[in-house]
Curated annotation (Swiss-Prot):
Mn(2+) 2 binds at residues 244, 255, 420. Splits dipeptides with a prolyl or hydroxyprolyl residue in the C-terminal position and a nonpolar amino acid at the N-terminal position. Also catalyzes the hydrolysis of toxic organophosphorus cholinesterase-inhibiting compounds including insecticide paraoxon and nerve gases such as diisopropylfluorophosphate (DFP), O-isopropyl methylphosphonofluoridate (sarin), O-pinacolyl methylphosphonofluoridate (soman), and O-cyclohexyl methylphosphonofluoridate. Can be used for the catalytic detoxification of some nerve agents neurotoxins. The gene is pepQ. It comes from Alteromonas sp. Optimum pH is 8.5 with DFP as substrate. Binds 2 manganese ions per monomer. GO terms for cellular component: cytosol. This is Xaa-Pro dipeptidase. Belongs to the peptidase M24B family. Bacterial-type prolidase subfamily. Monomer.
Length: 517
């Protein structure tokens, strides 16, 4: 029996327990989850890609089959009404025989309009959970998406079972493979469209399989927060690359973002490295008992410090925050819950009745304000951008005088930076799935080798690897340094703690392994 099969037993027991609790509280006979229906395009005979009801796929990994139903009361084995038509035009799904099938009483549905025979006869005290209210009404349901039931399920969706965490680790593994392929395509000078194709091939996803539409942006396009266009022609000069792309496994999402500088040199490369350090520090601040909004405020402080340190704004970090300047350069929230949905539900909830957890003052548009607790999964995605419209708004204010507009003009062609990981909060530790689950290939050991002879498991441009405390055959200063690899030029730099990087090797390195940092 595979690991997922073992974990699934506990998962279904958890869902049964939650269902039993809410139907007792609301005096219901049960809950009916509808997977959904295919939607036909207007004035056409083709359908939009099917997207399953997330509350349905919480129960089982059936994400591509409309007209399915689950009837659950928390005590009896749930009934799965599985749509399996007679159809010579399309591929018909196989009868369920995977590990999860044993946990359901399964009845096959040949025609969608025959489902009434398989649903409870008296539906007065059954809650319908789904999108198609007109279908529910026609079938005799009176309670459709009742707010107390929805709030209860949404609140508890934030607490992942071990099965769900295992699925999310797999989704991250898939996404990491895509990111590696996309990164390599960027350094080969490919177009946005070609980079997207490399990503899809590496993940073995179609665009419809992805958890969301990928953002693949080069140069100035990195400043467009939700850039979903793919230029077919490569730019004359590659400067920067921002990729926000995920994956799907059993209906669970990964959501990863990386930013690269093409040359690995210059101020934008330093800016990327600085934002990476802040992103890792913010990830490490996740802890049970904190409000997620507190991390968002700290992120603004860090962005302000970066703006000040790089002389983009001629003020101290505290002054930049006080004047509200950071919102021009960092206009979105720090992150969100992730799970069955990329922006998973329950992020604003203070309790299972649906009470709203207020955001920090001055930040009304956050996707997550909730108290952090164990078994929750978050994204952490700080950013720093040079967005024309927001810079124009800033220029029209009194804060205009504090901006180094020449520096802004130098950095605008790079667009912006965003770095994003997916993190599990445990009772006494954190698990950064994105970084800890990166693929590791065999490398030469650092121990006892001279600098030009080793390779490092780190693909990111100007990424850092602090080597073991055991000495290399170099002077003490070098022992305390950080080695930096630029994968396109395959040069090794060493960054001393107080000095600028110096080149210590220019000869070709052994093959650099491919992970994601």
């Amino acid at each position: 029996m595979n690991k997922l099969a073992v974990l699934y037993a506990e998962h279904i027991a958890t869902l049964q327990k939650r269902t039993r609790e809410i139907i007792e509280r609301e005096n219901l006979d049960g809950v009916v989850f509808h997977s959904g229906q295919a939607k036909r395009q207007f004035l056409d005979d083709m359908y939009y890609p099917f997207k399953v009801n997330p509350q349905f796929k919480a129960w089982l990994p059936v994400i591509d089959n409309p007209h399915c139903w689950i009837v659950a009361n928390g005590t009896d084995k749930p009934k799965l009404i599985f749509y399996r038509p007679v159809d010579f035009w399309h591929k018909v799904p196989d009868e369920p025989n995977e590990y999860w099938a044993d946990y359901f009483d399964i009845e096959l549905l040949v025609k969608p309009d025959q489902v009434e025979k398989l649903l409870p006869y008296d539906k007065a005290r059954f809650a319908y959970i789904g999108e198609y209210l007109e279908v529910a009404q026609a079938l005799g349901f009176e309670l459709m998406n009742p707010e107390p039931v929805m709030n209860f399920y949404h609140y508890h969706r934030a607490y992942k079972t071990q099965y769900e965490l295992a699925c999310m680790r797999e989704a991250n593994k898939i996404a990491v493979q895509g990111h590696k392929a996309a990164r390599d395509a960027f350094f080969q000078g490919k177009s946005e469209f070609e980079i997207q194709q490399a990503y899809l091939l590496a993940t073995q996803h179609s665009e419809n399989d992805n958890a969301y539409g990928n953002i693949v942006a080069l140069n100035e396009n990195c400043a467009i927060l939700h850039y979903t266009h793919f230029d077919r022609v490569a730019p004359a000069t590659h400067r920067s690359f921002l990729i926000d792309a995920g994956a799907n496994f059993n209906g669970y999402a990964a959501d990863i973002t990386r930013t690269y500088d093409f040359t690995g040199e210059g101020e934008f490369a330093e800016l990327v490295a600085t934002m990476k350090q802040h992103q890792i520090a913010l990830c490490n601040q996740l802890a049970p008992g904190k409000l997620y909004g507190e991390l968002h405020l700290d992120c603004h402080q860090r962005v302000a410090q970066t703006l000040s340190d790089f002389n983009i704004v001629d003020l101290s970090a505290d002054e930049i925050v006080a004047k509200g300047i950071t919102s021009t350069f960092f206009p979105h929230g720090l992150g969100h819950h992730i799970g069955l949905q990329v922006h998973d539900v329950g992020g604003f909830m203070a309790d299972e009745q649906g009470a709203h957890q207020e955001p920090p003052e001055g930040h009304p548009f956050l996707r997550c304000t909730r108290k952090i607790e164990a078994n929750q999964v978050f994204t952490i995605e700080p950013g720093l951008y040079f967005i024309d419209s927001l810079l124009g708004d800033l220029a029209a204010t009194d804060n205009n005088q504090h901006i180094n507009w020449d520096k802004v003009a130098e950095l605008k062609p790079f667009g912006g930076i965003r770095i994003e990981d997916n993190i599990i909060v445990h009772e006494d530790s954190l698990e950064n799935m994105t970084r800890e689950l990166r693929a590791r290939l065999t490398t030469h050991s650092l121990r006892g080798l001279s600098a030009p002879q080793f390779s490092i498991n780190d693909p990111a441009v100007m990424s850092e690897y602090s080597y073991p405390s055991e000495p290399l055959s170099y002077e003490e200063e070098i022992k305390k340094s950080t080695f930096i690899v630029h994968v396109r030029t395959r040069r090794i730099l060493v960054r001393r703690r107080t000095l600028s990087p110096i080149l210590i090797a220019v000869t070709p390195m052994p093959a650099i392994t491919a992970g994601l940092m």
